[in-house]
């Protein structure tokens, strides 16, 4: 289903709306402007009405475990609250970002006035690997005053559509600023029409998804890419204590390595292969132990796929310089190479050797892909290694357990996302 003018409509009605989309959005841009206060009040009201009795069943019906569903509902209430969003805007845009600023440039005698304006119409092409992402990316567009066209991810479970419907129902003034289209990525002719109606495209997802959007967009349409990134842990001898390793394993089990800030590879600060193999055995038992607290439930098809992948890894291990350590609901794979590569996910972790002297040149070969590093080291090493990781291109360093824990107003992939959704205009 689709959301047009605040109403849930079928495919045919969405296609009719798509034909008029340029005209409709132009009318909104000409006749209206969207105050951040209206968006904040609406989001806060939505946060207040979300409750377990009404909305927990919606999450449970999509196959989410009950404890996970409760956690996600609690997180949604926080992220939608006015207090949270105000702080996010303050951190990312500054306290007076929407107020005009007048000044006389050093090279002119006449004053100039600058102010922030929305880009106009944003097309959000959301990925399905992060809960609530379609809703949150639209809200970022609303906070900056933009009209938002959302193409739902194929795997969306209906929660995004319902939350945005509720938001527009709470504040009807948003109806001209939120459109949701349930079109398949293969329907290129329809996606192209959405692109043609947009001033900028916000694309989340894989390299293939980003490349596909680049091919669709004309040169004058701004691309705001939140593409595929890789994250890893770096472990030194001084960081190999039970608390650190259990925290890292807990993170791996909680995220199933599905997010851009999930640990794919554990790098060890050593050249000693025997030490690395010993680490593999010890960490596997920790991973198994933490896995019992967060049971892994996968569809039969996905479980079969993982089984085949692990079987293939085992068969090819000796010829590729690998050792596969199989456990109950988890595995670790020792690799002789030191490349940063994605794991097969779902608690199947890669272990590689990377002495700190080789850390920067190795990571520089993956520049543009680096996101979070979980640093497990001694206190006396932390400053030096943190600086080295930042110089290599990593954008966030934290503990292993906190790799996927965000905070209000944090940069995304090293950038302030809200700043990318505005433009600065000047009058002289």
Regions found by a protein language model. Give the residues of each.
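NAD(P)-dependent aldehyde/semialdehyde dehydrogenase
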Residues: 255-263, 267-372, 381-427
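Short glycine-/acidic-enriched loop or helix-start segments at secondary-structure transitions
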Residues: 134, 160, 211-215, 235, ...
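Conserved small-residue-rich beta-alpha loop and adjacent elements
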Residues: 94, 99-170
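N-terminal Rossmann-like NAD(P)+-binding subdomain of aldehyde/semialdehyde dehydrogenases
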Residues: 1-117, 370-375
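Conserved NAD(P)+-binding/catalytic subdomain of aldehyde/semialdehyde dehydrogenases
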Residues: 174-265, 270, 404, 410-428
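Short, surface-exposed connector motifs at secondary-structure boundaries
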Residues: 144-149, 173-174, 193-200, 365-370
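Donor nucleotide-activated moiety binding/catalytic core segment of transferases
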Residues: 108-126, 183-195, 329-345
């Amino acid at each position: 289903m689709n959301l047009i003018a605040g109403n849930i409509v079928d495919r045919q009605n969405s296609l009719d709306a798509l034909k008029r989309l340029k005209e409709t959005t132009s009318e909104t841009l000409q006749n209206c402007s969207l105050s951040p206060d209206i968006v904040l009040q609406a989001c806060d009201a939505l946060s207040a009405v979300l409750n377990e009795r009404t909305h927990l069943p919606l999450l449970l019906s999509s196959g989410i475990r009950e404890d996970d569903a409760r956690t996600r509902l609690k997180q949604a209430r926080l992220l939608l609250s006015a207090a949270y969003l105000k702080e996010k805007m303050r951190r990312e845009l500054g306290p007076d970002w929407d107020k005009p600023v007048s000044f006389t440039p050093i090279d002119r005698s006449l004053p100039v006035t600058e102010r922030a304006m929305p880009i106009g119409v944003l097309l959000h092409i959301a990925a399905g690997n992060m809960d609530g992402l379609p809703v949150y990316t639209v809200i970022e567009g609303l906070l900056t005053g933009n009209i938002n066209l959302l193409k739902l991810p194929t795997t969306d479970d209906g929660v995004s559509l319902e939350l945005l419907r509720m938001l527009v129902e709470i504040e009807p003034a948003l109806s001209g600023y939120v459109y949701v289209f349930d079109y398949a990525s293969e329907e290129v002719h329809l996606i192209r029409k959405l692109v043609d109606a947009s001033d900028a495209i916000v694309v989340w997802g894989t390299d293939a998804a980003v490349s596909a959007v680049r091919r669709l967009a004309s040169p004058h349409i701004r691309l705001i890419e939140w593409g595929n990134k890789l994250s890893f842990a770096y472990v030194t001898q001084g960081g190999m204590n039970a608390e650190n390793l259990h925290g890292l394993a807990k993170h791996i089990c909680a995220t199933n390595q599905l997010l851009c800030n999930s640990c794919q590879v554990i790098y060890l600060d050593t050249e000693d292969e025997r030490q690395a193999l010993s680490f593999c055995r010890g960490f596997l038992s920790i991973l198994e132990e933490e896995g019992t607290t967060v049971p892994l439930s996968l569809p039969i098809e996905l479980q079969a796929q993982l089984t085949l992948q692990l079987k293939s890894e085992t068969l090819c291990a000796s010829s590729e310089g690998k050792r596969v350590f199989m456990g109950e609901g988890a595995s670790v794979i020792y690799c002789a190479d030191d490349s940063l590569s994605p794991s097969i996910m779902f608690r199947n972790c890669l272990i590689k050797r990377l002495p700190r002297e080789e850390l920067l040149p190795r990571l520089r070969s993956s520049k543009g892909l680096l996101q979070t590093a979980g640093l497990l080291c001694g206190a006396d090493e932390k400053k030096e290694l943190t600086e080295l990781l930042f110089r290599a291109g990593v954008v966030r360093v934290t503990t292993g357990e906190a790799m996927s824990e965000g905070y209000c107003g944090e940069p995304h992939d090293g950038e302030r996302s809200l700043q990318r959704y505005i433009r600065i205009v000047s009058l002289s």
